[in-house]
């Protein structure tokens, strides 16, 4: 597809990848909520399979998710860390340059950072601050 002058195609692809970050994050969070509702004993893979056929959220990303949910051993063997290859960062940078709000893409990128333990120090400080001002409990490492 020809988008326009030099660089416009790369720009469009960058935005595509930023949208992908947000969509992936929403799908993963939704299935985490399904998994977390233990009293319903929901079959996440079966729900995802139903959504693949005629649901408004049907997509290739949902197909990949359902495939992953169907292999519990493989899913359990994966560390809960998500890399980024730069496109999300570039999209967020562009949003800042334009002054255009892009909270979903930004939070999806931040979630990837947090998955790598980059927030551990900040979270420890938050816990200690809460204990300091309100006597809230902290969980020991």
Feature names for model-found ranges:
Residues 139-141:
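Long, positively charged, glycine-interspersed low-complexity recognition regions
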Residues 7-136:
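Helical "substrate-binding/catalytic lid" subdomain
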């Amino acid at each position: 597809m020809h988008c326009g002058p030099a660089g416009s195609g790369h720009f469009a692809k960058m935005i595509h990848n930023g949208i992908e970050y947000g969509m992936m994050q929403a799908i993963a969070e939704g299935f985490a909520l399904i998994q977390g509702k233990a009293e319903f004993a929901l079959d996440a893979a079966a729900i995802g399979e139903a959504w693949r056929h005629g649901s408004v959220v049907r997509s290739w990303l949902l197909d990949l998710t359902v495939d992953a949910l169907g292999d519990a051993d493989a899913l359990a063997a994966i560390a809960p860390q998500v890399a980024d290859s730069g496109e999300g960062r570039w999209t967020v940078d562009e949003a800042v340059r334009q002054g255009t709000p892009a909270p979903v893409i930004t939070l999806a990128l931040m979630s990837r950072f947090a998955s790598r333990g980059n927030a551990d120090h900040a979270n420890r400080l938050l816990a200690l601050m809460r204990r300091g001002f309100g006597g809230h409990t902290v969980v020991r490492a």
